[in-house]
Curated annotation (Swiss-Prot):
This is Septin-14. Residues 412-432 are annotated as: Disordered. GO terms for molecular function: GTP binding; GTPase activity; molecular adaptor activity. Septins polymerize into heterooligomeric protein complexes that form filaments, and can associate with cellular membranes, actin filaments and microtubules. GTPase activity is required for filament formation. Interacts with ACTN4. Interacts with SEPTIN9. Interacts (via C-terminus) with SEPTIN4. Residues 194-197 are annotated as: G4 motif. Belongs to the TRAFAC class TrmE-Era-EngA-EngB-Septin-like GTPase superfamily. Septin GTPase family. Residues 111-114 are annotated as: G3 motif. It holds the Pfam family Septin. It comes from Bos taurus. Keywords: Cell cycle, Cell division, Cell projection, Coiled coil, Cytoplasm, Cytoplasmic vesicle, Cytoskeleton, GTP-binding, Nucleotide-binding.
């Protein structure tokens, strides 16, 4: 029995449905329905999958990049010391799996090697830019696949760049400005003053102000801690005013009274790494790991990656608007690009055919000329051979005639000799 066709349902618009989203009514539920547990589901899934964090450390050799990372995560990542004698800047990539309580973190640390050690430092930033672009390109290629698996994809895009500023000098070096200007559109930059214990407190604030003034005057975009979150607005606002952070790294334990703390022992006293009166290490750790890790990740995707993706798609010929400022669908862009590529392939194919036919004609002409040359040479040799044969035949004929003449002369000579002998013999007989 055939099923009756279902009549399409007609949705009657309601006045409330036509209102804007900001005018949507909020209703109080009359009972418990369970969707208040959605946040717990998300947390449980995230904990099960684990978290990942990718940090880029840019700074001169021996400035304390490895020590600060060890201090941040309170562990020894066992990194070898780098040499000062590299011909060019390189990158060292190391991945670690860390666990705190039941939360797993896959940490990738990318450190510059040989940065600032070359005489010519103009292109020192290029390996960093190339690496950042390569991670964006890898993610874009995965995203453009027909059969993609972004859930299982190991995202290697850098979430934050800790830029280590040398404590010596009165402001930024030209290399610092050049590098940050070339990477600020590709990564979240947090500047830190390394080995801040080398600067007195009175000079430190002046140094910070000089750095920030130079960053602003050169148009370098630093990462700003978000202030749109009610829970962290006040804290992030105050932290934005403390940039760049003055940090000191140390994994050594020293005794302060009855307590054991991480710090550095000096003849004049003890510097405690986790004492906010001594340095900004705790502020950096809290901002980086406790408060803004997710925002760093989000900014990497929605800001830096989207900029790279947009530029790459424009280079590939994709656009959202047509020539008449009309929206263009992806299918239309694809068909137009496909037609353009087909026409280009056809033109190139015709050019190749024309070049091929031209080469064939040139080769045929060359073969004909070579064949004619060989034929002429053959005819010449044939003529020479015939002339030589005729000459030899003539010489043979002459020799045969000479031989015949000699034979005749020999025969006549023999006849004459026999006649003489006979005559002599007769003369002798008469005389007797």
């Amino acid at each position: 029995m055939a099923e009756k066709p279902m009549c399409p349902s007609t949705q009657i618009p309601d006045d409330e449905d036509t209102q804007k989203e900001d005018n949507i009514r909020c209703l109080n539920m009359l009972g418990h329905f369970g969707f208040d547990c959605l946040a717990h589901q998300l947390v449980d899934k995230s904990v099960q999958q684990g978290f990942f964090f990718n940090i880029l450390c840019v700074g001169e050799t021996g400035i304390g990049k490895s020590t600060l990372i060890d201090t941040l995560f309170n562990t020894s990542l066992k990194d070898k010391k780098s040499s000062h004698f590299y011909a060019s800047v390189g990158l060292k990539i190391q991945t670690y799996e860390l666990q705190e309580n039941n939360v797993q973190l896959k940490l990738t640390v990318v450190k510059t090697v040989g940065y600032g050690d070359q005489i010519n430092k103009e292109a020192s930033y290029q390996p960093i830019v190339d690496y950042l672009d390569a991670q964006f390109e890898s993610y874009l290629q995965e995203e453009l696949k027909i059969k993609r698996s972004l859930g299982n994809y190991r995202d290697s895009r850098v979430h934050v760049c800790l830029y280590f500023i040398s404590p010596t000098g009165h402001s930024l070096k030209s290399l610092d400005i050049l590098t940050m200007k070339n990477i600020d559109s590709k990564v979240n930059i947090i500047p830190v003053i390394a080995k801040a214990d080398a600067i007195s407190k009175s000079d430190l604030q002046t140094f910070k102000c000089a750095i920030m003034n130079e960053l602003i005057s050169n148009g370098i975009q630093m990462y700003q801690f978000p202030t749109d979150n009610e829970t962290s607005t006040h804290m992030n606002s105050s932290m934005n005013g403390l940039l760049p952070f003055a940090v000191v790294g140390s994994t050594e334990e020293v005794k302060v009274g009855k307590r054991t703390v991480r710090g550095r022992q000096y003849p004049w006293g003890i510097l405690q790494v986790e004492n906010e009166n001594h340095c900004d290490f705790v502020k950096l750790r809290d901002m980086l790991l406790c408060t803004n890790r997710e925002d760093l990740k989000e900014q990497t995707h929605t800001r830096h990656y989207e900029r790279y993706r947009r530029n790459r798609l424009h280079m590939m010929g994709f656009t959202d608007m047509g020539p008449n400022n009309q929206p263009v669908s992806f299918q239309e862009i694809y068909e137009a690009k496909r037609q353009e590529l087909l026409e280009q392939c056809q033109r190139e194919e015709e050019e190749l055919k024309h070049k091929f036919m031209q080469r064939v004609k040139e080769k045929e002409t060359a073969f004909k000329e070579a064949e004619k040359e060989l034929q002429d040479k053959f005819e010449h040799l044939k003529k020479v051979q015939q002339e030589e044969t005729m000459r030899l035949e003539e010489e043979r004929r002459q020799l045969e005639e000479e031989i015949l003449e000699l034979c005749k002369m020999k025969a006549s000579s023999g006849t004459l000799q026999s006649q003489v002998c006979t005559s002599v013999k007769k003369d002798k007989e008469r005389k007797k």
